[in-house]
Each structure stands twice: as structure tokens, then as C-alpha cells.
A protein has these predicted regions:
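Short catalytic/ligand-binding loop motif for oxyanion handling, primarily in non-cytosolic enzymes
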Residues: 12-15, 41-43, 87-92, 150-156, ...
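Well-ordered, non-membrane alpha-helical segments in soluble/globular domains
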Residues: 57-67, 114-132, 164-178, 222
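Oxyanion-hole/transition-state-stabilizing segment in secreted/luminal serine hydrolases
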Residues: 67-118
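Active-site segments of SGNH/GDSL-like serine hydrolases
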Residues: 129-168
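Acidic carboxylate-rich catalytic motifs and surrounding loops in phosphoryl-/glycosyl-chemistry enzymes
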Residues: 144-148, 184-203, 207, 240-244
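Substrate-gating cap/lid alpha-helix
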Residues: 152-191
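Histidine-centered active-site loop/cap adjacent to the catalytic His
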Residues: 206-246
Length: 246
């Protein structure tokens, strides 16, 4: 079965990692390409048409056809989807200037209960979750490839200066909620390699793209992540070699 991997811009590091593993270790060829950036997740981007899931976002739809030569997601393909756990929209919301998760017990801040926080996460992920529900309902059984750990914010350039413990707690709880939601639907998630996180749970500089990019992992990170993806897939879905697209 062919392994196709697509998703948001975090897929770029995965593509570099897949290419390195093919060249250096003889891994079976895969088709790995990003569809677009994570800001596209804030609006509906998929629908069911004629019993198949299609992408309604114009950029996503164009990339799917260009790089995967398909117009819809079908059960005969094995899909790894890199969507979810890009939690920057959540923990960079200005509402956290006056509020804090209730489980942290921060004095002087309006407590956000666990139930309310779960609703915040569900609202942020609503279109991603709708996409996965659509895939399942049409017989496609995807797995999820998580976004990397968050990059430690630069205090000189970050506008919303939250305590690091609070920022990381928000991210961690959001990841747990997403994993639980996926688990209830029988969807596996491949999480970032533990060795890529520092002692506070942020992406180590050695694995971050760096420069003016505050979000993404680098090619070294992508290589480690793709090795973990292939280890996961070796247990559940034998791969069928395909011609790599230019």
C-alpha cells in the first residue's frame, strides 16, 4: 500500500527527512508534500462529494492533484496527515493576558476551567476534526503526524509574553485533548521524538529551523520524525513503492 503524507507547512521538514532516509538508508519511496500553511485550518477546507472526501480549499486542492495525482482521499491509499497540535493560535491569544488555566492556580488571573479549555481547543480544531470524521465516514483510515514541540519563544521579539510554564501547560493539555479525540475514533498519532524536546518541553534549538522562523522543525528533526513514522507504519501497513514526484 502506497504511503502518502500531506498536511500543513510542518510537512516540509518531513519531506526532507523522507528524502534523506530514502537516499541514506534505502527506505521505500514515499510521496510527501505540504498542502499549505496552518492558517488555512481556521476555515472549512474539506467536504464529502460523491462519497469521497475532497478539499474545498483551492490551494489545498491544487496541491493534492499536483503532487499526489488524486482529486479525493480514497481507502486504497494509506494517508499520514500532518494536521493538529500546531497550538500557537491557542496559546498566543491575547485573552491569556488576563486569564490562566484553572489547574495552574495563578493568582490574579481569571481561571479557565478544564471544560472551557476543552471547548477552546475543540473550536480551534473544528475543521481539522471535521476532516478526520469525513475520512473515517468514507472508509479512509488515516494516521496523524503531530506538529513538533513548540519552539521556545524569543523574549526580545515575542509580543505576548506569557510565563513559559503557562504556555507549555496550555500546549501540553491541548495535545492530550487532541490525542484523546483521535483515540476515540481509532486514529493513531505519531508524536514528536522525545529526544527533540528540552527539559521544559520545548523544541531543542538543534532541531528548530531557527532564524526568523518561530514554528518549524529543521531537516534533522524531519529525519528523526520520519524514522518514527516509518517504524509506526512497519507495524500496521506494508508499503508499495511508488515513483517519486518531482
Amino acid at each position: 500500500m502506497t504511503l502518502y503524507i500531506c498536511g500543513n507547512s510542518h510537512t516540509r521538514a518531513l519531506r526532507a527527512g523522507a528524502s534523506a532516509l530514502e537516499q541514506e538508508e534505502g527506505a521505500d519511496p514515499m510521496v510527501v508534500f505540504p498542502l499549505g500553511t496552518a492558517d488555512n485550518e481556521a476555515e472549512p477546507f474539506s467536504a464529502i462529494e460523491d462519497g469521497k472526501v475532497v478539499l474545498t480549499n483551492r490551494r489545498f486542492r491544487k496541491k493534492l492533484k499536483q503532487f499526489f495525482d488524486v482529486s479525493a482521499f480514497e481507502p486504497e491509499h494509506r494517508w499520514g496527515i500532518c494536521l493538529g497540535n500546531h497550538n500557537y493560535r491557542i496559546f498566543r491569544h491575547e485573552g491569556w493576558l488576563d486569564a490562566a488555566p484553572s489547574w495552574l492556580g495563578v493568582a490574579g488571573k481569571t481561571p479557565v476551567s478544564e471544560d472551557l479549555f476543552a471547548r477552546i481547543v475543540a473550536e480551534d480544531q473544528q475543521h481539522i476534526r471535521a476532516f478526520f470524521d469525513q475520512l473515517i465516514s468514507t472508509g479512509v483510515r488515516p494516521f496523524v503526524i503531530s506538529a513538533p514541540w513548540p519552539v521556545r519563544p524569543d523574549p526580545e521579539t515575542t509580543e505576548l509574553k506569557l510565563p513559559l510554564t503557562m504556555l507549555k501547560s496550555i500546549d501540553t493539555r491541548a495535545r492530550v485533548l487532541f490525542a484523546d479525540w483521535l483515540s476515540k475514533r481509532g486514529i493513531a498519532i505519531v508524536t514528536p521524538p522525545v529526544e527533540t524536546a528540552d527539559e521544559d518541553g520545548f523544541l531543542k534549538p538543534d532541531y528548530a529551523k531557527g532564524g526568523d522562523d518561530p514554528y518549524h522543525g529543521n531537516n534533522t528533526y524531519g529525519r528523526l520524525m520520519m524514522r518514527k513514522v516509518l517504524a509506526h507504519e512497519a507495524k500496521v501497513a506494508p508499503l508499495k513503492p511508488v515513483a517519486r514526484q518531482a
